[in-house]
């Protein structure tokens, strides 16, 4: 718990501060996805604030329902005496700066601590001539369940609003973690909720946990996601129905600088054109029968974030022209209105159609096609990546098992049958098959016979071409991809894979466990 004050320049450029904050957010997101106790996670988040941004002596207080007050959940200090003294400190609603944040649910910013009589200085930790920021941590219902506070390492300056907004974003990230602590105090089961939190955080900030696959085609998809996520360019996701195009769009958003802004979805094929226009652009009061008040459309809802337009190939030529204008100029009018609305939205579109062919036939505007197709990502159908089916089956059964509250396993013979099927409905069909198999299984074990009852048969698809050998020294591979590639080259023999990676058998066994790699039987 080293709280040595970091050295940094007194005057900070806004762009530098913004870059530092983005890096810190990424670090905090990774921290919250780790398999650790909640108090350790909180302390590590406070360490990031202290070391990377000069937000010193961070403090997280958590609602204590038994006493109707806030108790200290974590504090960043190198003083063991201060840490021990904090154990009994509580703040009642309205008491001190922390209690005021709890009572009113608003952030409090002090330009100089000594100038504000509300500051109680119970911890004797903060410089009274320096600023202090405290922000609320709220649950989804909007109730304050904790407070995040820290002291900037410089006197009040023009960056105080930016620092405050940043702490509010961090407080939002911490909200679920703090909510778990409150639930534990209420006597709820902690382990399942902690696991759920980790899944949610990983789902948002690690696409490897959203999109499963280790074959070369999927590794190329992952590499494309990493590259394009850093840019604001429009992305066109191509693939058959059921391949997971929305998951790819979500992964792009949550790996991008827009991750803390909205991710809004719309299926263009689900609405008639008249409703589609209102849904995307919004409408003014009285624009049509039933429009009793003004309503923002999906573009406005996604302002600053990402708008995912699924089934983009289904929109009419007339509507294509309206969409093109928004992509070109970033502006539109609500239905029934004449006031121009400007938005900053990244578009990720998806289709199962061959848009290039549609352009040649005159069914899709060429200029819109090129606006959408700045970067195209093709998702391979499941029949082209059957080697991913064992890992996919494990992943999907884990998801189904959590939803149904029962453990599920699958036998090797069932996996072989699943790998022999052509899966015209792709991953969606596989998930449906596994859920039906789970329902029909007596003890949660999915056997070949159970899978056969769902209608899946051995179709013996043509053998895929041999997979090209992966360069284990490739720096674009992450740890999980590198270990899987080594295992594939070693025929899934751990000792042989360890030699390829320059590891001991114990080290690779630890990596396999911590990286959640499902070993294939040979």
Curated annotation (Swiss-Prot):
Region (C-terminal DNA-binding domain): 480-522
PROSITE patterns: SIGMA54_INTERACT_1, SIGMA54_INTERACT_2, SIGMA54_INTERACT_3, SIGMA54_INTERACT_4
The UniProt record lists the keyword Cell inner membrane: no
Record domain GAF: where: 37-178
SUPFAM superfamilies: GAF domain-like, Homeodomain-like, P-loop containing nucleoside triphosphate hydrolases
Protein name (Swiss-Prot/TrEMBL): Nif-specific regulatory protein
Region (A domain): 1-184
Organism: Azotobacter vinelandii
